[in-house]
């Protein structure tokens, strides 16, 4: 059985399925994908996302606000914990830091990230981490906020082995995407080859 550990089912293109989500899900499940984790990127669309996947027990959800989502409702830890009480919820995120797409004073990203970690610790659920060009600050905040207690995954990892090894030491898993197949991704493939199989997604 295949498990898709990170998807956004509420944002998938349905052109090939005549805009029929049920047809898309039928085809996906028939292809051998047995379970999916539908990952939240903001709170405004979370109720709609949750309702969309409700008929499908093969889909779990997470709750969180992506670091690139600006002008969004800022999540308070208590609110995230309340939403995470849903039996179908298995994680907090996606959250983290992104210095590639965001500019200026990013203190708000740091605060948002800390709120997610606090929520994860409060409800005992793992974190889904998005990090891009923010290695030192991501690791520092994970340590400062005690993220080791809950662990989680660094999703769509594109950083170096030094960051991967430190994340592994903090109890996290490392997830790679199709980027590792790109011709110029030799360094990333070398990182993937060093991640223990039981910590690799």
Where are these regions (language model features)?
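Mid-domain alpha/beta scaffold segments of enzyme catalytic cores
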Residues: 1-201
